[in-house]
Amino acid sequence: MKLSMRLISAVLIMFMIFVATGMGPVTVEARTCESQSHRFKGTCVSASNCANVCHNEGFVGGNCRGFRRRCFCTRHC
């Protein structure tokens, strides 16, 4: 009987810990909007160069993407 009470207690504590870890604060991520850069010229090869041009345009960052390798600027919607 003692062993089964310990086992039940241990299982109950593990269950409570498992449930408590999933109930933490939830952070909400902002959506990301994209727009093609107006000032970037040529084929986009360097993502850091694209990001610098996008920063000068007032965006948060930028990435090279697509088959034609264009620079797309990103910002929070």
Swiss-Prot record:
Q: Does the keyword Ribosomal protein apply?
A: no
What does the entry state regarding organ or tissue expression? Broadly expressed.
Signal peptide stretch: 1-30
Q: Which CDD domains match?
A: Knot1
Q: Which UniProt keywords apply?
A: Antimicrobial, Disulfide bond, Fungicide, Plant defense, Secreted, Signal
On whether Transcription is a keyword of this UniProt record, the answer is no
Which Gene Ontology terms describe the biological processes this protein takes part in?
Answer: defense response; defense response to fungus; killing of cells of another organism
Q: Where in the cell is it found?
A: Secreted
A GO cellular component entry from the record: extracellular region
In this UniProt entry, which cysteines form S-S bonds? 33-77, 44-64, 50-71, 54-73
Q: Which domain of life is it from?
A: Eukaryota
Q: What does this protein do?
A: Confers broad-spectrum resistance to pathogens.
Q: Which family does it belong to?
A: Belongs to the DEFL family.
Protein known as: Defensin-like protein 2
**What is the scientific name of the source organism?**
Arabidopsis thaliana (Mouse-ear cress)
